[in-house]
Amino acid sequence: MAKATTIKIKLLSTADTGFFYVTKKNSRTMTEKMTKTKYDPIARKHVEFKETKIK
């Protein structure tokens, strides 16, 4: 079997609420850390989410 190209990552809110999303990314095409602007329901606004490892 071949090695999987997608890995699971955790997108953690930069608003320091502790809220996070779990998503997948292709590790071969996206080598840098992922950042996305998504909705944080605890902060009640759109904030930037940064990639961290799932523990």
UniProtKB/Swiss-Prot annotation:
Pfam families: Ribosomal_L33. It comes from the Bacteria. GO terms for cellular component: cytosolic large ribosomal subunit. One of its GO terms (biological process) is translation. One of its GO terms (molecular function) is structural constituent of ribosome. Gene3D superfamilies: Ribosomal protein L33 (2.20.28.120). Belongs to the bacterial ribosomal protein bL33 family. This is Large ribosomal subunit protein bL33. It comes from Brucella anthropi (strain ATCC 49188 / DSM 6882 / CCUG 24695 / JCM 21032 / LMG 3331 / NBRC 15819 / NCTC 12168 / Alc 37). The gene is rpmG.
